[in-house]
């Protein structure tokens, strides 16, 4: 899989993450944005990742990237929702009243913190039936499933979206220019945890 012109500025804080792991994180985040764009979704990218440059311009300047999460009707009116969503890696919005997926790109050590961030976000928005997705390397599957099955996350629709499935879906989108995709189609690429 080829990622066009990706620039990860030295000023971004990846919390001690190895540069290759950080680069992979950003590559997957961009693939998620491009998949969402293909499906007609607007995408929120974590506030701390907005300085990443892709194809010569900041992510924030790309079509379909939300500049402010609080501008969405499902977020703005609800106390604490904007703050709770600010650092979530990727949120897809289908119009103003649907969130097909809330996603955290994680590696083994960050799975629980990603689930915690998504749970906090979910607790600040109205009940909408979204998917709460951990996007992680394929080899982290067992760890993601174990963490997602903990009692504190039981009432969430937690899913595992392995990197290989992200890349497969990205390539399919690029080759076939998919349209009219349903959430059920997305479910084919994500494993339900509970």
Where are these regions (language model features)?
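Nuclease catalytic cores
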Residues: 1-53, 80
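Active-site metal-binding core of divalent-cation-utilizing nuclease and nuclease-like domains
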Residues: 21, 45-97, 179
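Domain-level recognition of nuclease-like catalytic cores that cleave nucleotide substrates
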Residues: 138-194
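Catalytic cores of nucleic-acid endonucleases
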Residues: 73, 77, 81-88, 98-162
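Short, solvent-exposed linear motifs at loop/edge-of-secondary-structure regions
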Residues: 26-41, 93-111
């Amino acid at each position: 899989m080829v990622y066009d012109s990706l620039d990860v500025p030295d000023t971004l804080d990846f919390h001690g993450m190895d540069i290759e792991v950080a680069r992979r994180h950003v590559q997957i985040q961009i693939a998620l944005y491009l998949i969402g764009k293909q499906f007609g979704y607007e995408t929120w990218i974590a506030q701390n990742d907005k300085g990443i440059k892709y194809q010569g311009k900041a992510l924030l300047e790309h079509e379909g990237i939300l500049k402010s999460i609080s501008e969405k009707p499902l977020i703005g009116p609800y106390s604490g929702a904007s703050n709770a969503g600010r650092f979530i890696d990727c949120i897809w919005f289908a119009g103003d009243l649907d969130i097909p997926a809330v996603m955290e790109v994680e590696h083994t050590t960050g799975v629980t913190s990603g689930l915690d961030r998504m749970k906090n976000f979910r607790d600040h928005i109205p009940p909408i039936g979204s998917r709460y997705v951990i996007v992680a390397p394929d080899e982290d599957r067992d760890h993601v499933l174990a963490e997602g099955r903990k009692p504190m996350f039981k009432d969430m629709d937690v899913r595992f979206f392995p990197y290989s499935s992200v890349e497969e879906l990205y390539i399919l989108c690029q080759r076939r220019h998919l349209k009219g995709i349903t959430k059920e189609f997305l479910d084919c690429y994500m494993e339900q945890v509970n």
